[in-house]
Amino acid sequence: MRKFNCIDLFAGLGGLSTGAVMAGHNVIWAGNHWDTAVEYHQLNHPNTEHVCQDLQQANFYQLPSYDCLLASPACQGHSLGRGRDLARHEVSRSTAWAVVEALEAGSPPLFEVENVEKFTDWNLFKAWKYAIESLGYSLSINLLDAADYGVPQNRLRNFIIGTKSKKPLPLKLEKQAPVTARSVIDLDSGNWSPIKTKRRSPKTLARIERGRRELKTDTFLIPYYSSGSGLTGRSLDRPIGTLTTVDRYGIVRGDEMRMLTVDEMRKFMSFPDDTKLPPQHKIATKLLGNAVPPLLQKQILEYVAAAA
């Protein structure tokens, strides 16, 4: 199997990097504008060179020599939950165009871009794709659900693979049996509280009652927003739904409930047990919710390395 020297643009907690290392590759450089993300990426990848800056202003000609570019550009402008502050999101971190600049400067034989499902609906996606193809790359666009590949979470994302070849390299990964939320959640841990309190939202109480009726159980997951299972509940005998950058899922057990612990979120994202995370629940949740599941990334790069 070929061994890649990788760089990681927009490196947060390091799902792309961690998966690459799990697949036997090196991550030699990583960058992000957020100092906390860089701090924890560095703690988890101490042998990687790190920079903290807006990557739209980076000089990619100064990067060390590499042969695989990994990138997860900002997804806020493409996701369904982007809200009304798109302008703030667009200036808060570099966009997908930084990938084009890096590819033009480094001309690696391989790259991988991860983003949300709606990324391909972006008004400038065709122009972005054309710009990359003009640099000599063939692109395959692969919509993958992490739950199909051993990750205990339904997480649908685009993985775009670019190669300097005449034909694209589509990802044909072997699917696996689903891993359930029950296998991750520790019902004996966490801070449980009574369901019926004065502070509990009537909408939350209604969702819990609907969950009891629909699932015919007193122990289940309750999303705090969304549609579908967000209106009722979610069985522990299926993968959890998509984790985001804020607390999204609670666990109902009889007449009490609690939110997911950071350690449970780490497991749902398939990060290794020795992953270093911030002690603050809110910051750890944000880093995990922005990440790529390393277990899926490992399989992607194993497949690409064998096929490239």
Please state what every model-predicted region is:
Residues 58-68, 75-235, 242:
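Class I S-adenosyl-L-methionine
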Residues 34-35:
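Conserved SAM/SAH-binding beta-strand->alpha-helix loop
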Residues 2, 19-26, 44:
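A short, Lys/Arg-enriched amphipathic alpha-helix followed by its capping loop at the start of a domain
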Residues 202-308:
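C-terminal target-recognition/interaction regions appended to catalytic cores
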Residues 47-54:
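Conserved SAM-binding strand-loop segment of SAM-dependent methyltransferases
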Residues 9-13:
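Class I SAM-dependent methyltransferase "Motif I" SAM/SAH-binding loop
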Residues 41:
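Conserved SAM-binding loop
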